[in-house]
């Protein structure tokens, strides 16, 4: 039956370099700047509003604006976050801020 064959019998073994010259495994990557890691103020506010959209305890959010949902939750005594109200009042005409995640989907 012969000897057991290996893939290296047909293809030569090629050792790859481990990285660019002067780079060793023990070195850490350089620290990124503070502004590249932190989100902008607008992105932070939009993320807060997305989390508000996903919070089921304030009721459904389809078919109404975020401000209407916040007001309804406030009237029902559900204590929605005041930060959400402040963000919505700061951007009264911007649909990115006023409309929920699902405003583009038909009812």
Swiss-Prot record:
Comp. bias intervals (Basic and acidic residues): 15-28
Query: Primary place of residence?
Result: nucleus
- Pfam families associated with the record: DNA_pol_delta_4
Q: Which GO terms describe its cellular component?
A: delta DNA polymerase complex; nucleus
| Subcellular location field | Nucleus
What does the UniProt PTM comment say about this protein?
Ubiquitinated; undergoes 'Lys-48'-linked polyubiquitination in response to UV irradiation or treatment with an alkylating agent, leading to proteasomal degradation. This modification is mediated, at least in part, by RNF8.
- GO biological process, alphabetically ordered: DNA synthesis involved in DNA repair; DNA-templated DNA replication; positive regulation of endothelial cell proliferation
Q: Which UniProt keywords apply?
A: DNA damage, DNA excision, DNA repair, DNA replication, Nucleus, Ubl conjugation
Q: Where is this motif: PCNA-interaction protein motif (PIP box)?
A: 1-16
Region feature (Disordered): 1-40
This entry's comment on induction and repression of expression is: In response to DNA damage or genotoxic stress, such as UV irradiation or treatment with an alkylating agent, protein expression drastically drops.
Which domain of life does the protein's organism represent? Answer: Eukaryota
Q: Which InterPro entries match?
A: DNA_pol_delta_4
Keyword DNA repair on entry: yes
Q: Please give the function described in this protein's UniProt entry.
A: As a component of the tetrameric DNA polymerase delta complex (Pol-delta4), plays a role in high fidelity genome replication and repair. Within this complex, increases the rate of DNA synthesis and decreases fidelity by regulating POLD1 polymerase and proofreading 3' to 5' exonuclease activity. Pol-delta4 participates in Okazaki fragment processing, through both the short flap pathway, as well as a nick translation system.
Quaternary structure, from the entry: Component of the tetrameric DNA polymerase delta complex (Pol-delta4), which consists of POLD1/p125, POLD2/p50, POLD3/p66/p68 and POLD4/p12, with POLD1 bearing DNA polymerase and 3' to 5' proofreading exonuclease activities. Within this complex, directly interacts with POLD1 and POLD2. Directly interacts with PCNA, as do POLD1 and POLD3; this interaction stimulates Pol-delta4 polymerase activity.
UniProt family annotation? Belongs to the DNA polymerase delta subunit 4 family.
> PANTHER family given for it?
DNA POLYMERASE DELTA SUBUNIT 4 (PTHR14303:SF0)
Q: What is this protein called?
A: DNA polymerase delta subunit 4
* Source species: Mus musculus
UniProt lists the gene as: Pold4
């Amino acid at each position: 039956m012969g000897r057991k064959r290996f893939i290296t019998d047909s293809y030569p073994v090629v050792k790859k370099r481990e990285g660019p010259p002067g780079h060793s495994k023990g070195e850490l990557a350089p620290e990124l700047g503070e502004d590249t890691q932190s989100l902008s103020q607008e992105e932070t506010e939009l993320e807060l509003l997305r989390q508000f959209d996903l919070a089921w305890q304030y009721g459904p959010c389809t078919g109404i604006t975020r401000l209407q949902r916040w007001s309804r939750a406030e009237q029902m005594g559900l204590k929605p976050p005041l930060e959400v109200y402040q963000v919505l009042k700061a951007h009264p005409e911007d649909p990115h801020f006023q409309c929920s995640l699902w405003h583009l989907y038909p009812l």
